[in-house]
Amino acid sequence: MAAAVLQGVPVVTSDIDFWIGLPEREHDRVLRICHQLGAKIVTDHIVELADGLELNFTYRVDGLSGFKTEFERAKRLLWLNRRVAVLPLERLIKSKEAVGRAKDRVHLVYLRQALKLKR
């Protein structure tokens, strides 16, 4: 939901999700880089930074096109003095709809409301 927060959606998140454009079998490469940068490895897909921030890595996103296509569609926003690619609200909504967990249904209310206000 950090992508939503960066786009003005009034929600709180305790972690940052990163979609990695590699096959999932390459997760060791990602974890090795994180470890070299001082992160604590929590699981094959989660690391914790020195300041306690949790990063979640995913290698596919339900309901969306492939990484390359979505990366080209992504919005470029400023985060921590860096330009980062984030999924637009419309794409976050599509993914949340596809996953359909209880927490995703709650997030959809806020995402749709924010999108409506932006239009």
Which ranges hold each PLM region?
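Compositionally biased terminal segments of proteins
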Residues: 1-119
